[in-house]
Amino acid sequence: MGPLVVTAVLARVDERGRRTLSRKLPKAIRADLDDSKRLLSHTDVALGEAWARELSAVPVSSPAQLFEQLSLEGLGKLKKPCESHVAGQCWNDQGEAFQAEAATLARVTKHRTALAERGVQLLSVRSSVVCTKQLNHAKGQGTNRFVSDLNAMEALVLELRAQAGADVEAVCGKVGGIAEYSKFFGPLSGRLHAILGEGRARSGYRFPGLGDGWVRLDGPAGSTAVHVPSAAVVTVAAGAN
């Protein structure tokens, strides 16, 4: 298996936005904002690129610049475990170029505006990458891939909580069929929290100074969402390449 990639999106959501998110989005938006496994492939990532470019803080001129801007860890930290003679296998960007056409970019911008008009203001995006070497090292230490996935989600939630500047509400897709998530917390371990409920359908936790976290079976597959009450929502999705 390739690296684990976990992505989080921060949005400001009011009561109207909560109603928007509680039902199906308009068909035109769903055509471009849905399960990535349905909309994208390894040979066609243009739509994902368009959303990433739309949500980047400043315009970028290359995929490498876009990755650096959106990366939670930053390229320097990600390259650190690499031995020099194999680094090029992961980090060679020669020949890389943007794929999204102007029409796709314009359509995504229109979707973002439409969501804002419905009370869902998309603010920013961050991605965390856990490479195969790190996954193997974690496995050797007794941490399986599902827990590495959960821990990456936690780190992204903390990052976007800092960006939001207010308590958040996190909603995550179930990870590995776990019910008692507090046993496997990494970045959140040691933090005071109350258990709001733990079960097959969903598990919930409240963290003073951070907000509420829900892990739900009915959340998007392999994903996490974080909401700041009347302020922001973070959605985190995981996938392997």
What is each stretch, according to the model?
Residues 1-241:
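RNase H-like, Mg2+-dependent phosphodiesterase core
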